[in-house]
Amino acid sequence: MKKIFAIVTLLVSLLVAVSTGFTATASAAGQQYPSFVDGAALVQPVDKTKLLSKLREIESKHGIRCAVLTVKTTQGMNIRDYAQSVQDQYFANAPKGSILMVISMDNRKWHITTDKTMRTKIIDDVVTGDLKDAFINDLKKGRYAAAFTNYGNKVDELMTYYEKEGEAYDPSKKFSFGAGAVAAIISFLIGGGVK
């Protein structure tokens, strides 16, 4: 019972802390829930402005929420659960879906979460593959503004693909010309040997 009480208390404090941070930032930005909240102070002010503008442009273009949140700590919460909680509380209201990247500096972890609608447009394999690959090197090197910009650019690219093709980008459906050539050679060899 004490563990359950501790977990509930932790979740309530987490939501109050995040809510307070969003409210303060939202008032300054004139937006209800900002697309970029740098609670861990990782990005220079000039880069914050550019990044916020970029994320808003992506959101406007595609009718989605595309956000980045940095925090000093998740207050002991698993990064995935923390990201999902923030997603559900602040970004799950976009009719065409939402995607959120959360970075916690206390344990140097990050997580990208999508809502149900967005999962039909950017599949989980792409989030952990192509999307991650777009920003991970800059993130590891501490080039946070570049990492977040690359994240936004890749989300924009994936959403453009979805809007053009009518389906989510799926790397497993790409045709491999190398595999096709090998298959052609093998079938030629087998076909030539059978008479």
Segments from the language model and where they lie:
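Positively charged n-region of N-terminal signal peptides that target proteins for export
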Residues: M1-L11
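Intrinsically disordered, low-complexity segments enriched in polar/charged small residues
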Residues: I7-V8, L15, G97
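C-terminal segment of classical bacterial N-terminal signal peptides
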Residues: L14-T25
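Folded, non-transmembrane soluble domains that reside on the lumenal/extracytoplasmic side of membranes
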Residues: T23-A184, F188
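Alpha-helical transmembrane segments
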Residues: F188-K195
